[in-house]
């Protein structure tokens, strides 16, 4: 989308992308390298739709998605839009074929330019009221004793969407600019790892 808008001279400084906070940071890298504003929002297409609504008439939305592989390519439908996404991927596949490439080739090209990404989800199930209490305690424990290292990589940034704070390893603290609080914790490591925890 961005590449073709650039080639056609249609990429504007007012264009923006949206991703949810738990979505791959490859999107952030794409936005950064192409000087496109990126907005992070909470999970759910209502939050992506909110970003479109607050920018209506001022900025142009050019795409957004979340980790569940949902994508919203246009601003007309304000929810996960599979039919439009299918049309868009068909258009991209046709363009790739004209270039003698496949969708897989394009994906590898994106990874080579912006960085590889691997995502996975771990579900911890604790049934009943006792389970709900255990999960609540897990979140409290993570807040009280945040990890300093994950998988052998040092944690350099910690985001708490309940207190709306970003803490850095150097001790500095910034406010998170979000429209509401959410019970989500994130850690960012030196090797590029991002871990998100939410009940």
Where are these regions (language model features)?
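Hydrophobic, small-residue-rich alpha-helical packing segments that form membrane-like cores
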Residues: 1-3, 16
